[in-house]
């Protein structure tokens, strides 16, 4: 099995932070989310990984080259896009990479899902595409539960499910992909033509799309407060994590915080539900539910 990480998006829901850092490099407890994904794939025994790039691609490419040097057993093939091609276009642009069944994962997904379960299900499904679904925040995927068959997308219903951003495909299906289209639209067209798209329903694992600030902060809260275990992240026994010594007088930490190294905090400051990045400078004041850089 091989894997492909979709990572070319502009991250508009994370502005203004994505003006300086591409979404795949957003740190979770100090570790880029794409590094967490790469480590998960490595621990699964996957040694060939493809990834597409567009927004602030030089920063992402430099990180990937550094990761590969540290992990020479992993081969990373980078597919640069001169313009955004959509998720379907990204697959077509890298079609020569897809020689066998491939695990595809969005680069903004934080999860502790056991990918091996998807692999075994895929091989028994006789379906060219299997999408991992759960009961989540955006329940717009309609599924025939009896046959694990997806019926439609983008219809909000109470009984519907949320796509986790994790799927597996047979490369033979790529010949049906039109250029520059979203994968969801492509799959709906395939369903309309009678091609089965299967659902792997998983409600016992953690999935968080960190593609907006609310969810980015919530992911930290889930790990620090609810003690959700992501094996590829550092475990902290307490919800107040302060890694800097540059702290003024009368600084108060509440609820949970993750304060990175080299952060400077002025005196008379209160921080609650806050994540800082390295070298952040925090002026005196009260901060709650914010990312400070």
Residue ranges, per PLM feature:
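Residues at the starts of beta-strands that form the adenosine-phosphate
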Residues: 2, 47-49, 75, 128-129, ...
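Conserved beta-loop-beta/alpha segment of the NTase-like Rossmann-fold superfamily
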Residues: 60-145
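N-terminal glycine-rich phosphate-binding loop and ensuing alpha1 helix
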Residues: 1-60
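Catalytic-core segments of class I nucleotidyltransferases/pyrophosphorylases
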Residues: 103, 110, 115-123, 135-138, ...
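Short internal beta-strands
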Residues: 49-53, 131-133, 275
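A structural motif detector for beta-strand N-caps
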Residues: 232-235, 239-240, 244-253, 257, ...
């Amino acid at each position: 099995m091989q894997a492909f990480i979709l990572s070319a998006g502009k991250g508009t829901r994370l502005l203004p932070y994505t003006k300086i850092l591409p979404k795949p490099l957003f740190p979770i407890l100090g570790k880029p989310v794409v590094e967490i994904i790469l480590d998960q794939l490595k621990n699964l025994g996957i040694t060939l990984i493809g990834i597409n790039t567009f927004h602030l691609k030089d920063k992402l490419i430099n990180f990937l080259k550094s990761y590969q040097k540290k992990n020479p057993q992993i081969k990373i093939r980078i597919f640069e896009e001169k313009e955004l091609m959509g998720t379907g276009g990204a697959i077509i642009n890298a079609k020569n990479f897809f020689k066998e069944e491939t695990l595809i994962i969005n680069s903004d997904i934080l999860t502790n899902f056991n990918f091996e379960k998807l692999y075994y299900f895929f091989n028994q499904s006789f379906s060219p595409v299997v999408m991992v679904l759960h009961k989540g925040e955006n329940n717009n995927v309609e599924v025939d539960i009896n046959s694990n068959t997806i019926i439609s997308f983008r219809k909000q219903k109470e009984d519907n499910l949320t796509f986790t951003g994790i799927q597996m495909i047979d490369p033979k299906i790529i010949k049906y992909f039109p250029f520059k289209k979203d994968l969801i639209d492509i799959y709906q067209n395939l369903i309309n033509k009678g091609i089965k798209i299967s659902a792997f329903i998983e409600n016992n694992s953690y999935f968080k799309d960190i593609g907006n600030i609310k969810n980015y902060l919530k992911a930290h809260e889930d790990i620090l407060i609810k003690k959700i275990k992501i094996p590829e992240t550092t475990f902290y026994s307490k919800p107040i994590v302060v890694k800097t010594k540059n702290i003024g007088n009368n600084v108060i930490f509440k609820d949970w915080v993750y304060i990175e190294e080299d952060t400077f905090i002025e005196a008379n400051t209160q921080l609650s539900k806050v994540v800082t990045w390295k070298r952040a400078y925090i002026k005196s004041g009260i901060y709650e539910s914010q990312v400070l850089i």
